[in-house]
Amino acid sequence: METKRVLSSSGSIDSISPLPDELLSHILSFLPTKRAASTSILSKRWRTLFPLMNHLCASLYLDDTDLLYPERQTEEEYYVIHNSFRNFVDKTLSGCNNNSLKKFSLTYEDDDVQRMCLTTGMMSKALEQGVSDLELYIYMPLMYEPPRLLPDTVFINNTLVKLTLGTELCLGRSPWENLEELYIHHIYIEDRDEEFNIHTAPHYIAHNIKKLTVCYNNDVQAPRILSIYTPNLVYLDYSDYLTCLYNSENHFNDLLEARLDLAFARAGRWGDEHDTCLKIMNSITNVQILHLSCFTVENLATLHFEGSEKEYWQLLCNMIEKSPKLETLVLEGLYGISDCEVGIDGGNMVKVVEIQEYKGRLEELNQVKCFLREMENLEEVKVNTSDEIENKLQLTNDLLALLPKRSSKCNIHVL
């Protein structure tokens, strides 16, 4: 169908005006909401298109960083601009068609915690529209006190399936009824108890959650304890200190993919986090995809590593790279590995390698070769063999042939 072209008052060809209102509203929906609203000043017709967009559109993205005049000149102008933004959000939500809005995203900055009640009002209006996907990012750069709690309606809403909470938002103590996806980014966790105590920590039960993301960028001045019971979790993305994650009831039996970016407090500042780490790793034994990263483990001197899967040994290389003071490495489970290339970037200071339950198979020898050629500071290699090994002298000669030139004086003990 050929589009009719209209000459504008300036003489140029206008291909927009002939389009139907519904199509123009759809085009507006691709603009940031505030920009779309600014088209209302173009003409009398355009004044009706933005409300129509809200009536038809299934998603709203409201961000005060997209204000038409974002420069903060004076304190008075700052409050005028942000009050205007809140009024704009309120009117925009009021113009939405009931049950048509599926996603609501709100991002803004405020220095007054007392106005949190206005924020909860915005959330309530969005939830009244039947929103299933709610995103909230509130920034309070000048506030030094905990923000107010989110309303219980956020957690017990019947339509909400996906919830994203970011910065300066405070979780209450309400359960999540129907959530399937939860994303937590640098939120404040309510804990009225002055003493750091796992038994009095906020406890959340979320039977339906399939995806959980917790991200704090390891930015914390005091310990946080968050206990979330998620028995049906299939995806976990966690980046923080370990005080926030582990619940003894969580075994993650259905977990298929996990991304762990773990941080450890200095000198056990908040308890034995390494024990917690071990519990977590033992609880994700059924995981199929594992992404593991952490900061440098500055003082780790001895590492005992056991694994019978190729992916585990690739993980070991990462552990060695992040342990600059590692001197003793104990390996077990080499018999389950074949064709696993080992590469350790940045060098290492490993002086002692101990291999347990060595069975003398070809794949084991190849795997030992991969590791030993990366150890240029080796002083001693201990091999604890199984009863299947008869010719220990030949084994010793084989291992000597694998050593890099810089470790040619290394002592080898076959036990």
From Swiss-Prot:
Stored InterPro entries: F-box-like_dom_sf, F-box_AtFBL13-like, F-box_dom, FBD, FBL60-like
Top-rank taxon, per record: Eukaryota
Bilayer-crossing regions: none
Cysteines paired by S-S bonds: none
F-box domain segment(s): 13-59
Name this protein carries in UniProt: Putative F-box protein At5g40050
Native source organism of the sequence: Arabidopsis thaliana (Mouse-ear cress)
Phylogenetic classification of the source organism: Eukaryota, Viridiplantae, Streptophyta, Embryophyta, Tracheophyta
Classification via Pfam families: F-box
